[in-house]
Amino acid sequence: MGCCTSKVNADPVSTVLVIGPESAGKTTLLRCVGRRCAGADESEPVRTMPTIGQEVEYLSAPGARVMLQEIGGCLAPTWPRYYDRAAAVLFVVDAAAPETWAEALVLLEELVGAVRDKPIGVVLNKLDAAAADGAAARGLLGLEELAVDVFEGSLTGRGALVDDLRAFALAARPLSIK
């Protein structure tokens, strides 16, 4: 299978935008996907700081290269500037922080309204936290009514989610340059 890489090669690059409210776990997910793809030790905890700006992780597989581009939650007003260049979007929500769901709902509705022709994935993150309520988050965010893929994640970013996100990202096709 493919791995993460920072080498330049001839395969076209797809961009998957990774966004969501502050402290939802976007950077942890990016780093865990990167570790898994690189075959690195996943037992060490992922250390992160709030993203001011962006974080980038590259994935590759035969015939495909993907740039996972996280734009920090504090930059939500700028997210629409990135939609045209993205082949797909991942929206990360902290399922253990119900106080953030109203903001997440507004941001998700704006995203779905603006991005109609590209795959959107929603990650309900931190479901292994004591305060997590995935069913309530799904209901409030209206995920059953939206045309989105839903993924479930943990505090550590470990588990099947990493492989699911990698598959979602690698399925994104590069946009043709106009």
Where are these regions (language model features)?
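TRAFAC-class small GTPase G-domain
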Residues: 2-175
